[in-house]
């Protein structure tokens, strides 16, 4: 499979594995009876450069937030999947992406791209989606970084 964003060939497993992991998180979350303002889904290799606590950003309970990334496609038909934050219902919709793959791809015509699939899962909330730019001095990814192989990079 070719990923247009990175211009690389990626395996289907690279998309399906995280979607299945999120499905399992959703299975656990559905059973949880605790009431929280926000639930956060994040990759294990992501960090951010900010001395500000997330709640100091004035997050609204009915909004959906994700990590900032520069580009015209984001929040139009893609969601950056490094860090995602929302109420239980929104996070459960994301966690349900794996179970809805056939519908999303075959019936709805969404490409096998987790950025597009996540946006499609939450499209009804488009007007309440925001990207969280934790450090505007980093223009590409707003202070969000990958931590891999002993290096820290924005992409």
Regions of interest found by a model, annotated:
Residues 1-155:
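ER/Golgi luminal nucleotide-sugar-dependent glycosyltransferases, focusing on the catalytic module
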């Amino acid at each position: 499979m070719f990923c247009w964003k990175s211009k690389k060939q990626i395996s289907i497993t690279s998309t399906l594995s995280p979607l299945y992991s999120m499905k399992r998180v959703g299975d656990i979350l559905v059973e949880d009876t605790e009431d929280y303002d926000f639930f956060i889904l994040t990759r294990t290799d992501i960090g951010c450069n900010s001395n500000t606590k997330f709640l100091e950003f004035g997050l609204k309970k009915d909004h959906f937030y994700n990590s900032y990334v520069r580009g015209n496609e984001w929040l139009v038909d893609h969601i950056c999947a490094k860090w995602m934050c929302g109420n239980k219902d929104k996070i459960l919709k994301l966690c349900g992406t794996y179970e809805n793959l056939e519908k999303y791809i075959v019936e709805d015509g969404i490409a096998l791209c987790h950025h597009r699939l996540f946006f499609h899962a939450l499209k009804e909330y488009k007007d309440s989606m925001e990207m969280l730019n934790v450090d505007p001095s980093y223009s590409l990814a707003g202070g969000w970084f990958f931590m891999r192989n002993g290096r820290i990079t924005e992409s």
